[in-house]
Amino acid sequence: MGKRKEGSYNFDKNVQMFLACAKDDNRPAMECVYFKGDWAYASDGHIIVKNRISECSNLDEAMIQALDGKLLHSLFFKDMLKYDDILISDDGIECHKKNDKAFFYFADDNLKYPNAEKVIQSYLAKPSVP
């Protein structure tokens, strides 16, 4: 990961998961990055990206747990990467860079993200073609 100030937290700016998200008003959950356990998922319905949060960020365990089950819109994820430091709350992510602050709310709790892990495992279980 790139250099960070001591005590600042964020995702690695090279991990641009927002690029894998759908741009589809009919499937708003797919426009989001989904956090489950120590994993972050993004999909457009054709491809799925899965990254271990503890490897693509410098977030501590409490911050990773606070993300569990949350959806963050892809545009918010993209903008979040522009900041030096993030704080995670129940409602969203507060971002800081010098005197600039922003708050990105998590997506509506009524949105349901598809079971990406089930899709990945079913694909991996298929026999390979020689």
Q: What are the residue ranges of the model-derived segments?
A:
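Extended macromolecule-engaging scaffold surfaces
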Residues: 1-130
